[in-house]
Swiss-Prot record:
It comes from Coxiella burnetii (strain CbuG_Q212) (Coxiella burnetii (strain Q212)). The keyword Manganese applies. Signal peptide: none annotated. Mn(2+) 2 binds at D42, N79, H114, H195. The lineage of its organism: Bacteria, Pseudomonadati, Pseudomonadota, Gammaproteobacteria, Legionellales. It is found in: Cell inner membrane. This is UDP-2,3-diacylglucosamine hydrolase. Mn(2+) 1 binds at D9, H11, D42, H197.
Length: 243
């Protein structure tokens, strides 16, 4: 049956070759069978600018380029790869999506988000997010030498890890009230997002109507894919390959 695939939170980097291997397997064996592929943020562990053309980044860009030649591929930036820009899109052939975006998925309106904006109890992250999403801040960051950007990215990741260790389970998750608000605002019955690394299908009720929230999984222990079929059925699928 015709279907569309959704992934997020691969956190690709040269230091985790197993995740890269799982992604390349996905590209070879799963993606070619789909109508389209959606990547919903934190595809990279860190992205410091489209001009950072390391051998590893070139390898990933070329793999996306091969995919996008034959399959519509959509890319939403996350909090780790928010500096991805139009040059990356041109090099890979992906179509960039704003966060949030409503798409028509087999004639059904579906809200797509990365997901970090839903975690409203994490006040420190929300303040950081408001800052880094300002165009002038991004322009300033991209004007810095690559060597300095690498150091800053490493510093930000270390700060993020320390911050996350101090947070409770509830604070790191989405806020139900914010989920309800955005789904009402966008007038949708299905929300798909990543970020929290807690793959699940949540049944909700909004304005008396049954709705669903699908959370995509991270790739730290293998691949994680949402398979959404033309008939409206869907499944979160995990896979592992022998390395």
């Amino acid at each position: 049956m015709r279907h569309t695939l959704f992934i997020s939170d691969l956190h690709l980097e040269e230091e985790t070759p197993s995740i890269t291997a799982h992604f390349l397997y996905f590209l070879k064996h799963q993606a070619p069978k789909a109508d389209a592929i959606y990547i919903l943020g934190d595809f990279f562990e860190a992205w410091i600018g489209d001009d950072n053309q390391t051998p590893f980044n070139r390898k990933i860009i070329e793999s996306l380029q091969t995919l996008a030649r034959t399959k519509p591929t959509y890319f939403m930036r996350g909090n780790r790869d928010f500096l991805i820009g139009q040059r990356f899109a041109a090099m890979t052939g992906v179509s960039l999506l704003e966060d949030p975006s409503v798409i028509q998925l087999y004639n059904k309106p579906v809200l797509l988000m990365h997901g970090d904006s839903l975690c409203t109890l994490d006040h420190k992250h929300q303040a950081y997010r408001r800052k880094i999403m300002k165009p002038w801040v991004q322009k300033l960051m991209l004007s810095l030498p690559l060597s300095l950007r690498r150091k800053l990215a490493k510093k930000f990741r270390e700060q993020s890890r320390r911050h996350n260790r101090t947070l409770s389970y509830e604070i790191k998750d989405v806020t139900p009230e914010e989920v309800n608000r955005v789904m009402k605002e966008q007038n949708v019955e299905l929300l798909i997002h990543g970020h929290t690394h807690r793959p699940a299908i949540h049944d909700l009720t909004i304005n008396g109507n049954p709705t669903k929230r699908i959370v995509l999984g991270a790739w730290h222990h293998g691949g994680s894919v949402l398979h959404y079929a033309q008939d409206g059925s869907f499944e979160l699928q995990a896979f592992k390959i022998d390395l």
